[in-house]
């Protein structure tokens, strides 16, 4: 069994040595740039860990794992363009370093490359892999569309939000694990349980992201705290604050959400205080713990010896141990 750290090293080395020998270079340069920015490489790591539950040669599916990482970074490239973001992982975003049209075209090419790389598997698995990958890619687009529509809605329900983050975030983690299982000839039942494990850990991971944006340490979290509050992003926190607030709290919350001219720190402090009064802090922690607990049940159901699952368990715990 490989450790997650060994797998991460394999993934990074493989990505670094992928060749782009097509022309024009100006189309492929932004792709190399995006994939060289680093990142946690969670999705390829999960795929290889799932494969390694059954087979001892995870290096055999590095191309498929890196296909998923290529796809994930394609979505980030286009997300940055839609959000008009300046920076990603401490680097200029593609549309800022080059231009909007280059970001669109290089992003589109990344999507095609992701499919080309994913297709490099044996024929018996090809249809199952591409069917799952295609449905997942469609679901992620659906999740992104819901997320954009929520920006202009003030009646978003908790269950709608959970479904949105399932589509936008969870299904790609789930897909990574299931593809790893399929390529390793796991049983259909094991592959499905690994998918559900990924789905639940993805929900916990995204809800924790919401939580850390309010209660995290910016030095550890890696970005400025309170960004979701200042942009009025419909998160688990804000949705439940509106749902559970009394009249006075709701009125103050509405005033801050409606404000066009405000002091950033004052707004973050005021909304955080309201969250504390309403009990959103504990509510969010309980929900994160619930989904993390559910994920463990699905991993428990995977029919391989416990010692083989240990590395995947440790990796899931590490995903959830970002500092508050």
Which residue stretches match the model-derived regions?
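All-alpha prenyltransferase/terpene-synthase fold signal
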Residues: 1-324
């Amino acid at each position: 069994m490989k450790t997650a750290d060994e797998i991460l090293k394999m993934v990074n080395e493989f990505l670094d040595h992928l060749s782009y020998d097509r022309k024009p270079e100006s189309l492929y340069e932004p792709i190399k740039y995006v994939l060289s920015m680093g990142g946690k490489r969670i999705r390829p790591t999960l795929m290889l860990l799932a494969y390694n539950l059954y087979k001892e040669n995870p290096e055999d599916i590095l191309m498929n794992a890196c296909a998923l990482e290529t796809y994930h970074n394609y979505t980030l490239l286009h997300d940055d363009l839609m959000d008009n973001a300046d920076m990603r992982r401490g680097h200029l975003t593609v549309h800022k370093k080059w231009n909007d049209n280059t970001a669109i075209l290089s992003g589109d090419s990344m999507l095609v490359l992701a499919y080309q790389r994913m297709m490099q598997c044996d024929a018996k698995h090809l249809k199952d892999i591409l069917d799952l990958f295609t449905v997942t890619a469609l679901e992620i687009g659906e999740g992104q569309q819901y997320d954009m529509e929520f920006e202009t809605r003030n009646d978003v329900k908790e269950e709608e939000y959970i479904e949105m983050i399932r589509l936008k975030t969870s299904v790609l983690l789930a897909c990574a694990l299931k593809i790893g299982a399929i390529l390793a000839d796991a049983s259909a039942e094991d592959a499905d349980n690994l998918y559900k494990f990924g789905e639940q850990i993805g929900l916990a991971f995204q809800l924790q992201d919401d939580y850390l944006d309010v209660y995290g340490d910016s030095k550890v979290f890696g970005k400025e705290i309170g960004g979701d509050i200042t942009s009025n992003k419909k998160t688990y926190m804000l949705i439940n604050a509106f749902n559970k607030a009394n009249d006075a709290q709701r009125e103050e919350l509405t005033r801050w959400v409606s404000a066009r001219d405000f002091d950033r720190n004052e707004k973050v402090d005021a909304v955080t205080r309201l969250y504390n009064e309403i009990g959103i802090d504990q509510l969010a922690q309980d929900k994160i713990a619930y989904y993390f607990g559910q994920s463990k049940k699905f991993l428990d159901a995977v029919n391989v010896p416990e010692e083989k699952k240990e590395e995947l368990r440790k990796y899931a715990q590490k995903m959830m141990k970002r500092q508050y």
